[in-house]
Swiss-Prot record:
This is Transcription antitermination protein NusB. HAMAP family: NusB. It comes from Chlorobium phaeovibrioides (strain DSM 265 / 1930) (Prosthecochloris vibrioformis (strain DSM 265)). Belongs to the NusB family. GO terms for biological process: DNA-templated transcription termination; transcription antitermination. The lineage of its organism: Bacteria, Pseudomonadati, Chlorobiota, Chlorobiia, Chlorobiales.
Length: 164
């Protein structure tokens, strides 16, 4: 049976949530959540390990990006689920070269709709990720290849210039 990346993202989100609430390490938290279906699928495990590894390895950097774009929010005030959805999407944007940015952002929004406690969470996640993505794109920090290539539409300023 084919496992889908969203299921894996949801398991990673649950592991990150567990990590915030329990005295455990991320690998143990993630291990409890893996289904036999995911464990039996080499591609699923590769994606799981890649995404989880990038979140673990780059958590401080990811948190700095989030903090820089949540102007009126201290990281400790962001709901645990929302913060971890942002972390996961940021790890995909920055370190998963084959995933298009729009997919990462859309997946984060859909997961926020499913797991967050308020209707506003998906809008919050969307706004923060959109702002971070645009900043990263302008800074040339989004490096995608293969299926992950970003569309090559001109920046917003260039679009308005083209209309004149």
């Amino acid at each position: 049976m084919k496992t889908y990346r969203r299921q894996i993202r949801e398991k990673i989100l649950q592991a990150l949530y567990t990590l915030e609430l329990r005295d455990t390490d991320i690998d143990s938290a993630a291990g409890w959540l893996l289904t036999p279906e995911i464990l039996a699928d080499p591609k699923a495990m590769k994606f799981f390990n890649l995404l989880l590894g990038n979140i673990k390895e780059h958590m401080e950097e990811i948190d700095r990006y989030i903090a820089a774009h949540t102007f009126n929010w201290d990281m400790s005030r962001i709901a645990i689920i929302d913060k971890n959805i942002l972390r996961m999407a940021m790890a995909e944007l920055l370190y998963c070269d084959d995933i298009p940015p729009k997919v990462s952002i859309n997946e984060a929004i859909e997961i926020a709709k499913k797991f967050s406690s308020t209707d506003k969470s998906s809008k919050f996640v969307n706004g923060i990720l959109d702002a971070i993505f645009n900043a990263l794109k302008e800074e040339g920090k989004i490096n995608k290849n293969g299926r992950g290539l970003i569309d090559h539409t001109p920046p917003r300023a260039a679009k308005t210039d083209a209309k004149s």
